[in-house]
Every structure is written in structure tokens, then in C-alpha cells.
């Protein structure tokens, strides 16, 4: 029989009477995890109860935070829109001027800082200048009425072309505005307008109809989106040489007739160029309606050819 000494009993009683905090730590993987676990859990629970609790967020505070976040986001979007609007407005408010001013009237003319057709001036006189215009694409529509510059017909045609430019096309592409707006008189009963795909043909009812066209942004080349409105046609204008006279003020039928007559008369004395047979004039208007009359730039042009050809 095994004998238990009194000293061993005394040591064991002393251990049991000690406080739980003084018990030796026992690793959970050892044989007596239950006793340690009980003391440890109680200690952890007391610590958790002593930790400060986060204050609850009311529904009103949540709504206010959401409104403030949405307002901040809307403000950021508005700032970007205002910045874009300011940049576009600056193109009209701070216009540029042509370098080829030949008289005092032209010196006051200005044009918006927008893309236009590419050309170079071959030479100029005090009455006109000769330009070589590189190929470009236009969107074109027939104008209602028999005059090219009545307010109703011009406004209706302008709006039709603007809708195409700003997204009324097959891919809903919004394109940048260009300048000038070109108006011309139809010369033939049938006029073929070429594009890579498809080939578009337009027929006019008579020779008294006018067409208005927008110069298309050059970055698209022949890959312009097709218009949804069947009255809008895409045309490529080939390279050509033109004689141009510029004038300010408002465009009227009477003013255009007078400018064309003076240009034809002046070209009769040109030693190198002559007006091509059967061509009609074109009118280019560069400025928005709010431009002061003396700052407007308008042009009448006639296609010409070399007399030696």
C-alpha cells in the first residue's frame, strides 16, 4: 500500500485554497484543459464587459450621411460639366482671326476656335483670294423653300444636321461642332454623293432647291456614323480650287447676289484662273447667331480652274 505523507497533503490543500488567478497556466493541448478553460473564459468575459461599446448610429444620421455623400458626388460631376461648358464657351467668346485679312472689314472679323476644312492660300488680291481646299466630308440636307437664307428654312435645316452631329445616328456618337456652315444651290437633277459604304444618291426635284451642310470632324475620315434621318446625306467633297470673297454682317439673298456678281467680275481680269463652267456659288457662315454683325465672317466662293488646263 502506498503511503501519503502529511507534507504532500498540506501542499495540495494550499494549492486548492489559492485564488484562480494564481493557478499555473496550463496549455490547452495538455491533459487538463477543462479546469483552465473555465477560469480563462470567465476572465475573458469580464474583460469584454469592461470594453467600451460603440454608440449606435440612428436612421436619421445614416440618411444625412447618404445625402451628404450624394451631394458631394453631384458637386464633383457638376464641376466637370461646368469645366467642359466653359471650354466650349471659350471657343466662341474668345474667337480667332484669319491671318489673311486684306482690308479693314476683314480685320474685325473673327471665327470660333473650331475645326474647319483644311486649305492653303495660293495668292490673294485686294478683292479676293485663291485657295486650294483639301478633301473633306460633310453631312448635308435639302433646305425647304426657294431661298437659301430665310429664317425658317435655315433654322429647320440647321436643327436637322445638329441632331445628327449630336447623336441621332446609328451608333449614337456625339461629334464635335465644326465651322463653317455651308449653303449652296442645287445644280443638277441627280447628284451622286460618294461614301465608302454605302454609295448614296440624292435627287432634287428642281434647280431652285438649296442645301445646307456641316463640315465633319476630320478624325472620322470616311468612317462616319450613318444618319438615322433619311434627309441627311453624307458626301465627300473632293480637292478643289476656289476663289473666295469675305464680308461681315448678316447674310441675305440680296447681299449674296451682289457679292457673287462682284466676284465674277473681278475674276474676269485674273490672268491665271477662271470660273469653271456651270458652277454655282457656295456661302460659308462661320459664326453663331449671337455674334455682333461687324465681327461675323461670311464667305462667297466660286470654284475655279487654271486657264492653262
Swiss-Prot record:
Any one GO cellular component localisation term in the record: chloroplast thylakoid membrane
GO molecular function annotation: heme binding
Keywords, in A-Z order: Chloroplast, Plastid, Transit peptide
Primary location class: plastid
One Pfam family matching this protein: SOUL
Presequence boundaries: 1-70
Transmembrane stretches, start-end: none
Localization terms from the record: Plastid, Chloroplast, Plastoglobule
Protein family: Belongs to the HEBP family.
Name used for this protein in its record: Heme-binding-like protein At3g10130, chloroplastic
Organism: Arabidopsis thaliana
Amino acid at each position: 500500500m502506498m503511503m501519503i505523507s502529511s507534507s504532500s497533503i498540506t501542499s495540495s490543500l494550499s494549492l486548492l485554497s489559492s485564488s484562480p488567478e494564481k493557478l499555473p497556466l496550463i496549455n490547452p493541448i495538455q491533459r487538463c484543459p477543462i479546469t483552465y478553460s473555465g477560469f480563462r473564459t470567465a476572465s475573458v468575459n469580464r474583460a469584454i464587459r469592461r470594453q467600451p461599446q460603440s454608440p449606435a448610429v440612428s436612421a436619421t444620421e445614416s440618411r444625412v450621411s447618404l445625402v451628404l455623400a450624394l451631394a458631394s458626388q453631384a458637386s464633383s460631376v457638376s464641376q466637370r460639366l461646368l469645366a467642359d461648358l466653359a471650354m466650349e464657351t471659350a471657343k466662341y467668346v474668345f474667337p480667332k482671326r484669319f491671318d489673311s485679312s486684306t482690308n479693314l472689314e476683314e480685320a474685325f472679323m473673327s471665327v470660333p476656335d473650331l475645326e474647319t476644312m483644311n486649305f492653303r492660300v495660293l495668292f490673294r488680291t485686294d478683292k479676293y483670294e485663291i485657295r486650294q481646299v483639301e478633301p473633306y466630308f460633310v453631312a448635308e440636307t435639302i433646305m425647304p423653300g426657294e431661298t437659301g437664307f430665310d429664317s425658317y428654312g435655315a433654322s429647320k435645316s440647321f436643327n436637322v444636321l445638329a441632331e445628327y452631329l449630336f447623336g441621332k445616328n446609328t451608333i449614337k456618337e456625339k461629334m464635335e461642332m465644326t465651322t463653317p456652315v455651308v449653303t449652296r444651290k442645287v445644280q443638277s437633277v441627280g447628284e451622286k454623293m460618294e461614301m465608302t459604304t454605302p454609295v448614296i444618291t440624292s435627287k432634287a426635284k428642281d434647280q431652285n432647291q438649296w442645301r445646307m451642310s456641316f463640315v465633319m470632324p476630320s478624325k472620322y475620315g470616311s468612317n462616319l456614323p450613318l444618319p438615322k434621318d433619311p434627309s441627311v446625306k453624307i458626301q465627300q467633297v473632293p480637292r478643289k480650287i476656289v476663289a473666295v470673297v469675305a464680308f461681315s454682317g448678316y447674310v441675305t439673298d440680296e447681299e449674296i447676289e451682289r457679292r457673287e456678281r462682284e466676284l465674277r467680275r473681278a475674276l474676269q481680269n485674273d490672268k491665271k484662273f477662271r470660273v469653271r463652267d456651270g458652277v454655282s456659288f457656295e456661302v460659308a457662315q462661320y459664326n453663331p447667331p449671337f455674334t455682333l454683325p461687324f465681327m461675323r465672317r461670311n464667305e462667297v466662293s466660286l470654284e475655279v480652274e487654271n486657264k492653262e488646263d
